[in-house]
Amino acid sequence: MDIHDYMQTLGRQARAASRVLATASTADKNAALVAMAAAIREQTGELLAANARDLDEARAAGLEAALIDRLTLTAKGIEAMAEGLEQVAGLPDPIGEITDVKRRPSGIQVGKMRVPLGVIGIIYEARPNVTADAAALCLKSGNAAILRGGKEALHCNQAIAQCVRTGLAAAGLPETSVQVVETTDRAAVGHLITMPEFVDVIVPRGGKGLIERISKEARVPVIKHLDGNCHVYIDRDADVAKVVPIVENAKTQRYGTCNTAESLLVAREVAPRLLPEIGRMLATKGVEMRGCEQSLAILRAAGIAADKLRAASEQDWSEEYLAPVIAVKVVADLDEAIAHINTYSSGHTEAIVTENYTSAMRFLREVDSSSVMVNASTRFADGFEYGLGAEIGISTDKIHARGPVGLDGLTSQKWIVFGNGEIRG
């Protein structure tokens, strides 16, 4: 296979399909999504067999347990995939929405219309469900998609892709609206991210190494986040009853997600009173605390086991652990907390626990991250929790989409003008 020619063909087909999708009716798009869901349910046995083949090859290759866990698809997971497609079908269609229409002194009316981006390239690792999720969101937002999944999920991704094509055909839409790259050759990624004539935006979902490579080499705009060093700051005016539940949920509900808290900041005035209880909770959960001198002194005095405590290094303040580890620092006040976050954060999600309205509003205004919260767990930074229905990923960039990227994030707006024969004087 000539990879260059193959990727060029995918690109041309996607561009042609995108023009059809841009004018496709909501009814046709929804019909395709519902038909995809039906095909996935009908092909449950085939999907499980394809996944078993992927798992056998993954174990033979000695892949780590965490990767195999992400790769594993169950009957319950397949049903959730089908339900996800149906849920996207039930979301409002953003395409064609007209907003902000204003009449100008000249007599013309000026507004904006929401339109698809065009062709979206999505690069992801060993998560077969992403194939269906990405197909659904791109289709509903009127975009064609080229999907390049991890080589570990090749067989399962191909089986899901067949269900997607079945759904598209049933609704009379081009089967090339969603194409899954059929080669594991890494050169395919290099071509996908350097085809601006065919691809309008790239969305990478995976490890930091993958995203750094794509950001460095892409000649196409990229919607991305590198990592999730999320902070929780306990203010001097925090409600004690809220502190431990928020920290517990933000850190320990799931360790491997990008919206998990990795750093805890505590105001000096309340640290001696609040840190011991937080520390006992974290130690009970098996979390290692990497602290500054002040925090370690407080935690040791509270009887926290030595094997759960460790002196923090400079690197710890910017680390995304994705593990039962958290960096802990005592800060003088809100000013130092904001400065620390804006220095070390990855720009993903930060939270303050406080009953002080002025402090809360300062935190919201001055912390430079894609999601900023007051008295809530960082784990809420999610498209579903934000009412977007579903998300393609989370962006920490400041241009175009920022934060959870749902259907609207996969669209743009163009200016539209209504006139009645007006000419410019």
Swiss-Prot record:
Species this protein is from: Aromatoleum aromaticum (strain DSM 19018 / LMG 30748 / EbN1) (Azoarcus sp. (strain EbN1))
Catalytic activity, EC: 1.2.1.41
Name of the protein: Gamma-glutamyl phosphate reductase
Protein family according to the UniProt entry: Belongs to the gamma-glutamyl phosphate reductase family.
Localization: Cytoplasm
EC top class named in words: oxidoreductase
UniProt keywords, alphabetically: Amino-acid biosynthesis, Cytoplasm, NADP, Oxidoreductase, Proline biosynthesis
Keyword Metal-binding: no
Pathway(s) annotated for this protein in UniProt: Amino-acid biosynthesis; L-proline biosynthesis; L-glutamate 5-semialdehyde from L-glutamate: step 2/2
Biological processes per GO annotation: L-proline biosynthetic process
GO molecular function, one term: glutamate-5-semialdehyde dehydrogenase activity
One GO CC annotation: cytoplasm
Alphabetized InterPro entries for the sequence: Ald_DH/histidinol_DH, Ald_DH_C, Ald_DH_N, Aldehyde_DH_dom, G-glutamylP_reductase_CS, Glu-5-SA_DH, GPR_dom
One Pfam match: Aldedh
This protein's encoding gene: proA
HAMAP family attached to this UniProt entry: ProA
